[in-house]
Every structure is written in C-alpha cells, then in structure tokens.
Regions:
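A ligand-binding cleft/hinge motif common to bilobed small-molecule-binding domains
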Residues: 124-126, 283-302
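Conserved C-terminal helix/tail region of periplasmic/extracytoplasmic solute-binding proteins
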Residues: 36-42, 274, 373-400
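Hydrophobic residues within well-ordered alpha-helices
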Residues: 100, 127, 272-277, 323
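Short, polar/charged alpha-helical segment
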Residues: 42-51, 58, 63-84, 175
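Mature extracytoplasmic/periplasmic domains
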Residues: 314-381
Length: 400
C-alpha cells in the first residue's frame, strides 16, 4: 500500500535529521579530541623548548623554610625537565617591578633578566597597568585542572587577574604566642594596645614597607574603622587623612610602649619569630597560619607555641606567580609554574613540617598533612592603592 506523499516526506526528513545528528556528534567529538591533541602537542613543544633553560625566579628570600622548598623544587625541575631554577632572593618584590619598568623604558622586549615573579596586590596591579606581564597563560597549564576554582583566584586585591598570574598559595595574617608565657593573647588590636601599655617593650611589628608590617597596619586600619567602605575603593586624597586618622592616633600610643620604644622594628617575620623564641617579644607575626609547625620542626620555635587569628578574623589573600613579558626563559617559566601547581609540589609545600603554605588545589588532589592545613575566618584586603599610600605616610611619620 502506498503511503501518503507527506508521510513519506516526513520519514525521509527524519532520516536526514537523524543522520545529520550523528554526523554532528562525530564531528563535535572529533573537534574535542583534535583540540586536546593540539593542546598536548603545544605543551610538549613548550617542554622541549624549556629543556636546558635557566629560570630566574624573583621571590622573597626571608624564610628558611621557603628557601629550602625552592631548592627541592629546583632539583625536581632539573631532573624531570632539564630546567635550572635560580632563586633570586629579594626583600621587597617592588625592587623587581622597578627593574622591569627600567627594561621596558629601555626597549628591552626580549632576553629580560626576570623569568618568574612571586607577587600579589599592589605589585601585580603596577605590573599589569604597565603591560609588564606575559599572558594570559594560566588556563593552558596542564595542572590548571587541579586548582580549586572556588577560591578567589580571578581577583588579586580586587584587581582582575585575567590569566596573567597563576595562584600559588593562600596567605592569612596571624600571630604566634608561647602558651607557657602568654596563655590568653590579645584578641583584638584594642586589647593589644592595652597589653602593650600594661607590659611595655613586649610587642612590635615589622617595619613597613616590609610586607608583614604593611599587612599589620592594614589589618589595624580595618578594625579601627570598622572596615570603612572607602577601603574597598581606590584611595583618594580627599578622604585619606580622615579615614586613617584613627590609625596614626593608635600607633602614636602603641609605639611609646612597643619594643625598643617604637624606635626600632623587626626586619620581617623571621626576626619577629626569632625575638619571640629569644623571649624578647610575646607575639610574632606571620602570613602563614601553619608556619609555626615548620618552625617547630626546624627547632626555631618551642613546641608550646601556637598560631592564632584575632577575634574578627585574619587579613587574607592569594599569592601568585607571573611571567614578565620579556622573560628570557618563557617556556622554562611556564614549565616551572606548571610543576609548582602539581599535586606533588603543592602537597610538599603544604606539608606542616616543610612550609605549611595552604594549597590552591582542591583537597582531593593533596596528600599528607597538606590536606588539613589550618585556615581562619578571612578578612578581605583593601583596594591595592591603599598599600602604597599607607607605606608612604608611615615612613613620613615614623621612618626616621
């Protein structure tokens, strides 16, 4: 029996649609596999280019634990990829920013002296604004898939990262005390001032613009102003003095009763930890909640020491790795950063007996004590422009 023409046409069209659907699925799958193959081939080329390169990594050099960790990473990179890692120890990464600005001004767009920088905040914003960074590159790293995307990795002190820097770890400003000598440490900056007045010469903080010192005064300003909304906006000459007035009033009082009368300050977290261990200070400061464990393991702190955050929480941020636009070892830099994001490298970095730096990977990819690193309630950083303004004013008032 002959079917109606329109019915035959409908069956014919259904076959065509079905066939096209299968073809589209096959084509889509082929595209995915082709993209993956291209991506793999591209990364293989980068690894081949990286072999034999020397990577100059500009990073803070004020921690024995961090320095030893980078020595381990250097051995792994040499053995596994043929990449030589040179840790260029800097006191303040702003020195590296100045170097890169000079190279930019001189038209040195290749064969630069810096291959990787460890940065965040104001230094990232400065490098980004002056087009000093290579990228975006982060999502092309094979180990990017392990990164915990629930972390605020797409912003750095409110500045969009736009793939120009890869997250490396999580920082939180906390204090360390010895439970045997100070059972109930101050839980706020208000209590800290009262403690210093009751027990003069026992408290201090690193001298700004050292990172920990600047973080101390930012955290103090947030508490004193009840986290004034102006701090989340670019700093303004119109409101700077008004917003920061409580900060300088507090520090004027604090310095009078601080260690050495506020005339001298620890150079950084390492010295504050040493002064705590020597019994000269009752509190040390760190941006790593777990550094107390590695310091205990290396004999730098007593087993009775403990890290804690103030009652309101801890100033918190992500720290990042970036590649300058003119890096001489660009391929080697990408391979290095990719390795530092591997579960192996992040697990070792997070090991409480090695560095204890909280990882940026999802915990399911971590092993050992890195899976259980301690984190406190977080307080957001102010807008990065406040950092430079606060440091300048601090130096003007107390720098001599």
């Amino acid at each position: 029996m002959l079917l109606p023409v329109h019915y035959q046409m409908e069956k014919f069209m259904n076959k065509i649609v079905s066939t096209l659907g299968i073809m589209a699925t096959v084509a889509y799958s082929a595209t995915i596999y082709a993209d993956e193959a291209t991506s793999t081939d591209s990364w293989n080329q980068i690894e081949q280019q990286a072999e034999g390169e020397t990577v100059y990594f500009h990073a803070w050099g004020g921690s024995q634990e961090i320095n030893r960790y980078l020595q381990w990473a250097g051995k792994k990179l040499q053995n596994d990829y043929g990449v030589t890692l040179k840790h260029v120890k800097v006191t303040d990464i702003a020195e590296t920013t100045t170097r890169l600005l000079a190279e930019k001004a001189a038209g040195k767009n290749t064969e630069g002296s810096v291959d990787i920088v460890w940065i965040n905040g104001e230094n990232f914003r400065s490098m980004k604004d002056n087009a000093l960074l290579f990228g975006p590159f982060t999502e092309s790293l094979p180990n990017w898939k392990y990164v915990d995307k629930s972390l605020p990795i797409d912003v750095d002190f409110s500045e969009p990262t736009e793939g120009l820097e890869a997250p490396w770890g999580v920082g939180q400003l906390v204090f360390i005390h010895d439970q045997e000598t100070l059972h109930n440490p101050p839980q706020s900056f208000s209590e800290m001032l009262s403690y210093a007045q009751a027990f003069p010469n026992r408290l201090s903080y690193p001298r700004p613009p050292e990172f920990h010192g600047t973080s101390f005064i930012k955290s103090l300003l947030i508490e004193l102003t009840n986290n004034n909304p102006a701090l989340a906006q670019p700093v303004s000459e119109d409101n700077f003095q008004e917003v920061t007035a409580p900060l300088w009033a507090y520090l004027d009082k604090f310095h009078k009763v601080a260690w050495r009368g506020g005339k001298q300050f620890p150079a950084g977290t390492s010295e504050s930890i040493q002064l705590l261990d020597d019994g000269q200070l009752d509190l040390a400061i760190t941006f790593n909640p777990n550094s107390v464990y590695s310091a205990q393991a290396s004999g730098r702190l007593a087993e009775t020491t403990k890290a804690y955050a103030l009652e309101s929480g801890a100033l918190s941020n992500i720290h990042f790795l970036a590649i300058p636009w003119n890096a001489n070892a660009n391929a080697g830099a990408q391979v290095t950063i990719n390795f530092l994001l591997s579960p192996e490298a992040q697990s070792r970095k997070g090991d409480l007996n090695i560095w204890g730096d909280p990882s940026v990977l999802s915990s399911k990819y971590l092993t050992g004590s890195a899976k259980n690193t301690q984190q406190f309630k977080s307080i957001d950083e102010p807008h990065p422009s406040w950092q430079n303004a606060l440091e300048k004013e601090w130096l003007k008032r107390y720098g001599n």
